Swiss-Prot record:
PROSITE patterns: ARGE_DAPE_CPG2_2
Gene3D superfamilies to which the protein is assigned, alphabetical: Zn peptidases
Coiled-coil positions: none
Gene it is expressed from: dapE
Its EC number(s): 3.5.1.18
GO molecular function terms noted in the UniProt entry: acetylornithine deacetylase activity; cobalt ion binding; succinyl-diaminopimelate desuccinylase activity; zinc ion binding
Organism name: Nitrosomonas eutropha (strain DSM 101675 / C91 / Nm57)
Protein known as: Succinyl-diaminopimelate desuccinylase
Length: 378
């Protein structure tokens, strides 16, 4: 049906699904897919709504991962049209979630519809994992569904995450991996005192400074063929009472690693503690792992998606691991081949978020051709 993907995208954008509120988006998808033979399960945790819906029981299983939640709009007055009234203007669809990532969800659903109509006896299975908790804490969304699937022994063979990956034109970038994210909350202890009597105090900012300098100058690894070198950066420093005559009793630092597969979580932790200990600091350090790095080398899935992109757009996609974390990091625990592909990301999270209307239908064709290459060919 002409423009069916656009119509579905508009239906989803019209829902005010601010994290963790799905606002009925998943019900739209369940209703749409029921007629194709999909069996749907609500896997809700806390305030988060998750959907696992699958057609077929045989392998291979191709899964699409997406999120219906969106970030806040910012000042509505700065939008040229209401962010939850999907508006087509000058060849673009405007609205919060247009690019990130309701158009991708719509495109995959219509791709399935056309695929099943053309190939009703296809081999394998198709599934969607949709959450309303990707833009927020991401602790009761995809990760919880993955844990549930793991517990009952379900395995995903190929996974496409619908994140907006392209930069200049549709098809130019496939994400075939992401760096890991490891954060630290470091408190260095000192002795508070009068700044005129430093011999009666111990300034933790002064004692921590050499260690901070060493951490900032350390080469953690050299990266590899797929990833740049691991980086360490401070995001926040807090210390002192606000007075100019008081030596602080402690200083607090928040820092973050973005790390490649050339390093491990434990190796990074060990090296940080070694540096802090070598400088004789009295400290407390709390770690938080947001996600491990994952990588899908060239293979069946990346090749199939790349070929589909070339057929539809004529563009040769680049495989990239740049950018922040995504829900792909959770799927990688139960799927060895995970890639991310969606529309251009130039306007995501911005005022007047938009996606080119022509790209929405092209994206659906790319997804359908990818399904054909994965589920029709031996």
């Amino acid at each position: 049906m002409p423009n069916s993907t656009l119509t579905l995208a508009q239906m989803l954008i019209a829902r005010r699904s601010l994290t963790p509120d799905d606002d009925g988006c998943q019900k739209i998808l369940v209703h749409r897919l029921a007629g194709l033979g999909f069996n749907s399960e609500a896997m809700n945790f806390g305030e988060v709504e998750n959907l696992w819906t699958r057609k077929g029981i045989d392998g291979p299983l191709v899964c699409f991962v997406g999120h219906t939640d969106v970030v806040p709009t910012g000042p509505v007055a700065q939008w040229d049209s209401d962010p939850f009234t999907p508006t087509v203007r000058d060849g673009f669809l405007y609205g919060r979630g247009a690019a990130d990532m309701k158009s991708s969800i719509a495109a995959f659903v219509t791709a399935i519809e056309e695929f099943v109509e053309l190939h009703p006896d296809h081999k394998g299975s198709i599934a969607l994992l949709i959450t309303s908790d990707e833009e927020g804490p991401a602790v009761e969304g995809t990760v919880k569904v993955v844990e549930t699937l793991q517990a009952r022994g379900e395995v995903i063979d190929y996974c496409i995450v619908g994140e907006p990956t392209c930069t200049d034109r549709l098809g130019d970038t496939i994400k075939n991996g992401r760096r890991g994210s490891l954060s630290g909350n470091l408190t260095v202890k000192g002795i508070q005192g009068h700044i005129a009597y430093p011999h009666l105090a111990r300034n933790p900012i002064h004692t921590a400074a050499p260690a901070i300098a060493e951490l900032a100058q350390t080469v953690w690894d050299d990266g590899n063929e797929y990833f740049p070198a691991t980086t360490w950066h401070i995001s926040n420093i807090r210390g002192g009472t606000g007075a100019t005559n008081v030596i602080p009793g402690e200083v607090n630092l928040l820092f973050n690693f973005r790390f490649s597969t050339a390093s491990t979580v434990e190796s990074l932790k060990t090296r940080v503690h070694e540096i802090l200990d070598r400088h004789g600091l009295e400290y407390e350090l709390v770690w938080e792992l947001s996600g491990k790095p994952y990588l899908t080398p060239k293979g069946i899935l990346a090749d199939a998606l790349s070929a589909a992109i070339r057929e539809v757009t004529g563009v040769e996609p680049e495989l990239s691991t740049s950018g922040g974390t995504s829900d792909g990091r959770f799927i990688a625990d139960i799927c060895s081949q995970v890639v991310e592909f969606g529309p251009r990301n130039a306007t995501i999270h911005k005022i007047n978020e938009s996606v080119e209307v022509a790209d929405i239908e092209r994206l659906s064709r790319i997804y359908r051709l990818t399904l054909e290459k994965l589920l029709l060919q031996d």
